């Protein structure tokens, strides 16, 4: 039996989460989705979206990397991008609260 897990994105693009086509993954999909997705299962005292979190991680990484990797611009840029996009998968697969993610029954989710 073949399963699909297709979702429709804001621009009507469809993406199969089990067999994602890289050509259908776009930076605007990521930016829009992460700006609408709250951290901490939306249970924080303040609204704190994943996009803001990603930006703050990248800004902190920039400060650190500037001092450590300033002479190696290639590593510096890659580290900044990695920091900015570290939660980009959440644009397509929502994040689960940590305690739930750790359950053995959720191994399939971690695999995806």
Indicate residue ranges for each PLM-predicted region:
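Metal-dependent phosphohydrolase cores
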Residues: 1-112
